[in-house]
Amino acid sequence: MSLSTSELLELCGFLVSVAKQGGKIITSAHPSSSDFAAKKNSADIVTETDTAVECMVQAELKSRYPTFDFVGEETYKTDQRITEAPTFIVDPIDGTSNFVHGFPAVCISLGFVIGRKPTVGVVFNPFLDELYTAVKGCGAFYQRADSERQKLPLLSSPLRGLGPACIGIEWGSDREGVNFELNLKVFTTLARTRETGGRFVNSLRCTGSSAITICRVAAGQQDLFWECGNWAWDVAAAWCILNEAGGMIVDGHPGEWDPPINNRRYLAVRPAPSGQKEIVEEFWDVIGDDRSTYGPPQ
């Protein structure tokens, strides 16, 4: 099934209105350490607000688009698959731990895919009133509050390798085993001086929200974002925004330039007139032969 550009633009506008409804729920909540439950450990938190936002989003989307599939973080089942059908992929609150701690890097992420390819993306941070949107073939845009909408990227220059790069990277919730060891290797190799076997990159940033970080990559404000262990709802909306801005997402493991939406390993690269391929290969060289256990569902 395909939708016309006008239909996709209409869908995007509807997603923006739904995202702003969700934003009101998020900003009206007052989470504390007494009302959250740990999913896996204290670094992976789910709140009642997640569920409330997702229920609202699902109801609104099903009412308007009853035949489209829906995949949401809070209602996901382990046997659920993303098919070729038109599918909404939703993270009601990306940056839940930030939300609980009052750190305003929090967003609602509403993605739409057709044929498992990012087609529409809406990412809204209600605390900073920042909105990122994209429709396939129509470009990507950023708007803060009532300011004029700006086309992405906001900044663009050649990529000049890892040395001068500002890289988004996260520890994730695995703090032992091979996944943690790979994170540790990548972190330390990027940070170390060249004299001690590292790449001595300009800066590493842990924001706590994959969607927001990928949008910053799309804006040209960060050069790369790497994480293994993410889910499709963490990246689907921002992926469309990055693509439309002229950036790209490749596999978080070396070798695959066109990973599936549910790959669970992602390396995002900002828009640039040159240097994208070279910086990807340089980053993959940091990973080397080590691998995480994450990958698309079998």
Model features per residue range: what roles?
Residues S157-N183, F187-T207:
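Short loop->beta-strand "edge-of-pocket" segments that line small-molecule binding or catalytic clefts
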